[in-house]
Regions:
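A short glycine-enriched loop-to-beta-strand structural element that forms part of the catalytic core
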Residues: 12, 94-108
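Catalytic-core segments of nucleotide cyclases and related cyclic-nucleotide turnover enzymes
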Residues: 109-127
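Catalytic/regulatory signature loops of cyclic-dinucleotide turnover enzymes
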Residues: 121-138, 142
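Hydrophobic alpha-helical segments, chiefly the membrane-spanning helices
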Residues: 157-163
Length: 163
């Protein structure tokens, strides 16, 4: 580490992990790893398709950053929906469920990694989400309210065409 001033930025952080992963690993490591890889392909694709970047993983957990909370929530909903569809077509022992935490906060940039309360809060929120669920911080939610107009609001804001 250098003595230079750390760079910080505002980021939408997505933290996700598999519910009951340790138990599944204890029951059948090879099957669990095979299923994790299949599910991670779904998760990783949704993150990438919505302009996110995975900056750390550990075992079954994934932490990603997004420039926009809208992209983060779209990615989370997309992969939860796709994991649910996968589970519907799998044997019970092949099913996995993720829980997701979302936060908007300042982070410190160190190489390709991010640190700080913005990341820590997302991880804490994730741990309180139910299986297949998505929890978000109040700050993240408030930002969504002001950046994602409802269909009704979009209709109101349309300008009439000039003749």
């Amino acid at each position: 580490m250098t003595d230079s001033t750390p760079i910080s930025k505002l980021a939408a952080i997505l933290a996700a992990d598999v519910v009951g992963f340790s138990l599944k690993m204890g029951e059948n490591e090879y099957l669990t790893l095979k299923n994790l890889k299949a599910c991670r392909a779904i998760v990783d694709s949704a993150i990438k398709n919505n302009q996110g970047r995975i900056f750390t993983t550990a075992g079954d957990s994934v932490i990603a950053e997004f420039a926009s909370p809208v992209n983060a929530i779209v990615a989370a909903v997309e992969f939860q929906k796709n994991i649910m569809a996968r589970n519907a077509s799998c044997a019970e022992e092949d099913q996995m469920q993720f829980r997701v935490g979302l936060n908007l906060g300042d982070v410190i940039v160190e190489g390709d990694n991010l640190y700080g309360d913005g990341v820590n809060v997302a991880a804490r929120i994730e741990s309180s989400a139910e299986a297949g669920g998505i929890h978000m911080s109040a700050k993240f939610y408030d930002c969504l309210l002001y950046t994602s107009p409802s269909p009704r609001d979009r209709q109101k804001s349309r300008m009439p065409s000039s003749a």
